[in-house]
Amino acid sequence: LSYCWDDLDMAYMLEALLAAKGVELIWDKRCLKLDDSISQFMSLGCDCSEVILLVSNSYLKSQSCMKEVLEVLNGSEPLQRIRPLILPSAQIFSPEGRAGYVQYWAGEYEHLQKEIRKIGRGAAAGSLNQDLVLLNQIYENADHFLSMLADRYSPTELLEFVEHFCAGRQQQGCISRPSYPLTAPGGISLRS
């Protein structure tokens, strides 16, 4: 599951609905432990047969989420593996909406480039330059990614998405019971 932390409640609901259908999600809240590398975990999306993208406005403006998208896009057969759930806040279905995200990433790139110039390229030779390269990659791929999402049929309602997702997995023989305890924020059990 690729999602923005701003959408954590929706991610827990998605997990609970999928678990009830026998689908176990691999996501940071269940798999990462203290001091684990988030970047290494994010790169796992390249190896998964399916990646659910919980796409919201926050997701599309998150450098971490878009880095994860690039990892998936650079993996094998990304169109066959991406399963987007487009939330209402994501403005991807109009050219103006998509253009707004491309402009956003152009602005993020320009802003960091100016900040690096202020401190000097030598002082920013490490991670800041890597971030600048990443922002440029996000900017260069944003239109392609957003157009791909807008062109695909993907339910925008959570329950409908779960039904379609599980129907596809059942046809492939991929349904199993989650092996970990399911709890929502506050320790509420999601399993009866």
Protein language model regions, located:
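Hydrophobic beta-strand scaffold positions of dinucleotide-using enzymes
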Residues: 1, 52-54
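C-terminal interaction surface of TIR/SEFIR-family domains
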Residues: 3-20, 87-192
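Short glycine-/small-residue-rich Rossmann-like dinucleotide-binding loops
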Residues: 5, 56-57
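Conserved BB-loop
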Residues: 13-43, 58-64, 121
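Short beta-alpha junction loops
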Residues: 31, 57-58, 84-94
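An anion/phosphate-binding loop that grips the pyrophosphate of nucleotide cofactors and donors
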Residues: 48-49
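Hydrophobic/aromatic beta-strand patches that form the interior of the parallel beta-sheet core
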Residues: 52, 81-85
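Conserved TIR/SEFIR loop-to-helix hotspot centered on a Trp-containing motif
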Residues: 57-77
